[in-house]
């Protein structure tokens, strides 16, 4: 159900509270998921005119789970705070003295419900942390992370019995990784259609038993960061080592991600240097180039009255990854009506060369390769 449809069914006197939750409500580490409401119901009689829903189920993303809490207002007394039912978490009993925004409920503040939900989620986090006492090993993992503020202050935990019959205990740690994304080139961050939200990397580590013999890590990137780093398949984190600890494993993943970010930033500046060198060396032979991301360059060149194009595609992780050179005859066509072309990646190249050296080496390679390309174009293409 979309937020607008849901709000149209809410009692008008309660609408400001719920609107703040579903439109602006981001609670916890996962900034890519908003709060949402379902199961709208009314405690009013059927004779009540207009929208009258005053109770609903609130879905809250937390540590890779979705908490489903029932929130119950009274549409006849909209200035009163709501009641809460915590679904399957019957053992969760919040401390009323710590719910300041509930104790001093201010119906003139449209964010008062959201503020209470945030306080409840904080208490729920403490409740989940306390459950780790059932496993000394998992409690050790938690306490060692807690000693490091960069991890301890950005962590969510979901713990409990995976199987009520066997009593088997499991837990999931969700950590917001302290990785700086601020220097990623803006052109890489703008091609995401949806609301990008915060640029964030979350590491989920699931312990399937209390002794940590089965541990499954997974990395989640916000949409813009995933796009900037080359898609979901571009980053593979290492398996959790047998006998390893989170306090050792998490920094390794942070370093891996930081290195990826640095590769992308370096690649952008190196591509710009590369294209600037080609503009200098080939001058009027440059037909077009990508002036934003510096990922493409096209040259129109001539060798002994034979005109040809060279399309250069520079990869995201340039100069580590070698550019592709595609030679294209301006005279010859394939059977499908396309200009005859050949792509080359087997040519002299070193990622250690600067842009000027790469341009000089490319010019020398063109002179050696064009004769055989011309011969192939005449042999295989059609005029």
From Swiss-Prot:
Region described as UEV-like 1: spans on this chain: 30-147
GO MF term set: polyubiquitin modification-dependent protein binding
GO terms under biological process: apoptotic process; cell division; chromatin organization; double-strand break repair; mitotic G2 DNA damage checkpoint signaling; positive regulation of DNA repair; response to ionizing radiation
UniProt keyword annotations, A-Z: Apoptosis, Cell cycle, Cell division, Chromatin regulator, Cytoplasm, DNA damage, DNA repair, Mitosis, Nucleus, Repeat, Ubl conjugation pathway
Any one Gene Ontology cellular component term annotated for this protein: cytoplasm
Record-stated family: Belongs to the BABAM2 family.
Record's protein name: BRISC and BRCA1-A complex member 2
Organism whose genome encodes this protein: Gallus gallus
